[in-house]
């Protein structure tokens, strides 16, 4: 086994794209490791990970073998009867084989197999030096990096994410003499652009992280992240509040700085009259600042900026940040004030001139459909239908507001504020906001009954219209986000415990569409309904998989196509509990056997069991047990207590096992055969009343 040495590779660049930086760092790291592995060079990875700052991408590995392992090869040659003539001299076949191997035939070895003895060429080739392999490995790694917009600079023909300024290639204490992207490898790196003068000569790779830290560079993104959180929290406590640190904002800031330093800033209290969501949006999205909240979660007039330098005059840095934010806040206040003057209801007039989709009419048309759906759904879930209609009629009006035009992410949120200002009931203003929930994967569903109704109605219209208009997603194309809408609808129904009949709701949604896209003879309501139902179930499959539900459990319930998604969920829970019972596997296998037997039956199976035709003790016992189980589970089925149903059915296992062990189903006597099939059908129907449990059979 060859010696291992630490390896350091650093590409020093101009400032790299913030959003692309994590992906570039990971791809560079993975590419180097893959190149070493492909060539059989042993690596001790330890806790190594991608290292990066806005000005560098680095790979630091604690141990890399100095050379490849020996390469052993074996090439089989001709058999002796072909290789040697009668005098034992080499034939042309053997001479050619030896020449191809590059040795004299007398140096060849011999081996035997079932056909006889033959010549073989065995060779041991020394492994290549890792230092000689690294330049090509790096070129491959760089070529495979996901660079969004490659740049060219100077007179060079090559391209990279940003111009490369320096290159560290240090293997042990030795520089690898190679050139990449127009720069020769060296041991010289650079510190912070403003806080460190001069180059840094590295004696060995192990010096890298500490040497850069001394030069005011935290090359580990995790270290920068921890420092930012620590400093931001401390600054917020100093202001008497707590910082809002969103993951997205934090990641952006981590990749903007090399030596983060928190700066506490403030703005005029008058701006707090603007909805805080707009101010937070401005701070986080536009400026990458961290808002400071009070104990009640309300925005204060303080915020925190992250400088890429420890300034001697922090107050001056704060003033600069405050100068930047002030005009943006002034714009937001202007938009808000102007919108209030117009009023939420008046904004809706413009929706009639905005096309929602060519076949589905204007946004105003969509609003009317959603309002009708909301009014129809509300009484089914205990919400006020009048308020549901009113909330739906106002829910899209803020799309015409100046605020949403500037901050699209505030749709619904802005509407809530404008509805409140207009004196609408709090239930309506909240529902206008909650109609958009869940806004993204992992987001909460709406909390209020009215918000849930609007969320369901909005998504139902979007899905019904999309499928009727032929907009079903294909591949990566989903311009109307039908996949997200399907999951949002399903989650809202299930997590709210709403026992709604989905096929009937789909029919209502389809019936309200424009005549041009309504189901017709060539593609009737039943076809569109089934297509959309299956689409929603397909989204649910991923939802349950994320929750750890086995695919077999999902398929067992899906086969029954429950009309209610909430009922679907209860069946999923019940089948999960049933699967843990010791009787589950045997009953699942039995039900599978029953299905296979009944599938082959020609003609009608009797609906009732004739007790006078029960000949065997095992079939008598099973018939009695099945009738008892049907009687015991009827009420539980009616109450949707599926756990109780399956627990009771599990007690049938002894009788089921005894029946299949001792009774011939396909008896010669047609009356006996028909009666036994009737017994199996009754048993199978009840075993499959909660889910197609045969899916649990391995």
Swiss-Prot record:
GO terms for cellular component: cytosol. Its main location: cytoplasm. It catalyses: tRNA(Gly) + glycine + ATP = glycyl-tRNA(Gly) + AMP + diphosphate. PROSITE patterns: AA_TRNA_LIGASE_II_GLYAB (PS50861). Transmembrane segments: none annotated. Keywords: Aminoacyl-tRNA synthetase, ATP-binding, Cytoplasm, Ligase, Nucleotide-binding, Protein biosynthesis. It holds the Pfam family tRNA_synt_2f. Its EC number is 6.1.1.14. GO terms for molecular function: arginine-tRNA ligase activity; ATP binding; glycine-tRNA ligase activity. InterPro entries: DALR_anticod-bd (IPR008909), Gly-tRNA-synth_bsu (IPR015944), Gly-tRNA-synth_heterodimer (IPR006194). GO terms for biological process: arginyl-tRNA aminoacylation; glycyl-tRNA aminoacylation. The keyword Metal-binding does not apply. It is found in: Cytoplasm. Belongs to the class-II aminoacyl-tRNA synthetase family. Tetramer of two alpha and two beta subunits. This is Glycine--tRNA ligase beta subunit. It comes from Xanthomonas campestris pv. campestris (strain B100). The gene is glyS.
């Amino acid at each position: 086994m060859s010696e291992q040495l630490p390896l350091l590779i650093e590409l020093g660049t101009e400032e790299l794209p913030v959003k692309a930086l994590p992906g570039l760092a990971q791809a560079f790291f993975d590419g180097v490791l893959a190149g070493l592995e492909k060539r059989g060079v042993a690596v001790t990875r330890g806790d190594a990970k991608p290292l990066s700052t806005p000005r560098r991408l680095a790979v630091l590995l604690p141990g890399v073998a100095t050379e490849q392992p020996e390469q052993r090869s074996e090439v089989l040659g001709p058999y002796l009867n072909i290789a040697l003539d009668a005098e034992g001299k080499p034939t042309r076949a053997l001479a050619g084989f030896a020449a191809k191997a590059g040795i004299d035939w007398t140096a060849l070895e011999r081996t035997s197999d079932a056909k006889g003895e033959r010549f073989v060429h065995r060779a041991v080739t020394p492994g290549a030096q890792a230092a000689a392999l690294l330049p090509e490995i790096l070129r491959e790694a760089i070529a495979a990096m996901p660079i969004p917009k490659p740049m060219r600079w100077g007179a060079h023909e090559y391209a990279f994410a940003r111009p490369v300024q320096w290159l560290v290639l240090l293997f042990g204490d030795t520089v690898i003499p190679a050139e990449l992207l127009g720069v020769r490898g060296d041991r010289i790196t650079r510190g912070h652009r403003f806080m460190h003068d001069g180059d840094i000569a590295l004696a060995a790779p192990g010096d890298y992280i500490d040497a850069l830290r001394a030069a005011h560079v935290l090359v580990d993104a995790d270290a920068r992240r921890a420092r930012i959180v620590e400093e931001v929290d401390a600054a917020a406590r100093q202001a008497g509040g707590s910082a809002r640190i969103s993951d997205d904002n934090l990641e952006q800031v981590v990749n903007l700085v090399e030596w983060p330093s928190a700066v506490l800033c403030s703005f005029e209290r008058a701006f707090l009259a603007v909805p805080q969501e707009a101010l937070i949006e401005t701070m986080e999205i536009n400026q990458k600042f961290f808002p400071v909240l009070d104990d009640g979660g309300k925005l204060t007039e303080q915020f925190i900026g992250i400088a890429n330098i420890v300034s001697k005059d922090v107050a001056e840095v704060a003033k600069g940040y405050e100068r930047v934010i002030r005009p943006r806040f002034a714009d937001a206040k202007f938009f808000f004030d102007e919108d209030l003057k117009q009023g939420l209801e008046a904004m809706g007039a413009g929706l009639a001139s905005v096309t929602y989709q060519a076949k589905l009419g204007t946004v105003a048309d969509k609003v009317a459909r959603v309002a009708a759906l909301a009014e129809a759904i509300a009484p089914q879930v205990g919400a006020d239908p009048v308020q549901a209609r009113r909330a739906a009629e106002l829910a899209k009006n803020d799309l015409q507001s100046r605020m949403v035009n500037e901050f699209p992410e505030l749709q619904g949120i802005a509407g809530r504020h404008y509805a409140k200002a207009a004196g609408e009931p709090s239930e309506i203003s909240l529902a206008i906001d909650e109609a958009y929930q869940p806004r993204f994967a992992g987001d909460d569903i709406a909390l209020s009954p009215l918000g849930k109704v609007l969320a369901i109605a909005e998504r139902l219209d979007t899905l019904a219209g999309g499928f009727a208009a032929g907009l079903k997603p294909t591949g990566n194309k989903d311009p109307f986000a039908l996949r997200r809408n399907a999951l949002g609808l399903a989650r809202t129904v299930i997590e709210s415990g709403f026992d709604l009949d989905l096929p009937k709701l789909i029919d209502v949604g389809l019936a309200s569409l424009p005549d041009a896209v309504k189901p017709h003879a060539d593609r009737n309501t039943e076809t569109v309904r089934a297509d959309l139902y299956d689409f929603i179930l397909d989204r649910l499959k991923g939802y349950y998989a994320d929750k750890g539900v086995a695919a077999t459990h999902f398929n067992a319930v899906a086969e029954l196509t429950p009309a209610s998604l909430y009922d679907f969920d209860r069946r999923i829970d019940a089948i999960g509990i049933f699967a843990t019972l010791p009787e589950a596997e045997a009953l699942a296998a039995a039900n599978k056997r029953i299905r296979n037997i009944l599938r082959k039956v020609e003609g009608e199976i009797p609906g009732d069991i004739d007790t006078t035709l029960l000949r065997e003790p095992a079939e008598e016992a099973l018939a009695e047990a099945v009738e008892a189980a049907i009687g015991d589970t009827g009420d539980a089925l009616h109450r949707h207590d599926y756990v109780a149903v399956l627990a009771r059915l599990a007690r049938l296992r002894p009788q089921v096992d005894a029946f299949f062990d001792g009774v011939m189903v396909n008896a010669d006597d047609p009356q006996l055969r028909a009666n036994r099939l009737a017994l199996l059908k009754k048993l199978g129907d009840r075993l499959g009343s909660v889910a197609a449990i045969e899916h649990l059979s391995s």
